[in-house]
Amino acid sequence: MDPRDPESLVFPVALDIPGEITAAGSTWFRRPELHVTTFTPDDLAAASELDVEALVRAGEEHRDELTRPRAIRFDGRVARVEAQDGRRTLVAFCDVAGLDILYERLSAGLGAPLPLPPTHVTLHTAQPGAGGIGLTTEEQVRERATLLDDADAAAVLGHLPAIA
């Protein structure tokens, strides 16, 4: 990882979901690649006041643990996320097995608490083939995400397993 261009670390998620759904008054298209972001050095630096280079080193030291697939459990929250450039996505928030314990170890090694990321999977986009929208801190969730109402959330969650 180059500290001048810190890399986000992710693990892939395999889900059998439809290529197109209708929810929240729009048609949405499946993302070609599904993942959970586990570690974003630049956003963690801003949220924790830790040095980005120290976070990059910690990410490298724990890369295998941060990028290996883990069990996830969708928690029932689904949100529409909007970027300033007009892109829109649908995300399902999830719990990630063992990520809290890993973050405790990372925090101990860095000598400061690291906030857990708001773990989620970006499932669909408003434009076919569009990328995701950064959602790696609670502040970004508050600024960019709007929870779907129960009926629309159920329409999305109906395609997801409780545990992946």
Language model region names:
Residues 1-164:
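Histidine-dependent nucleotide/RNA phosphoesterase domain, centered on the 2H-phosphoesterase fold
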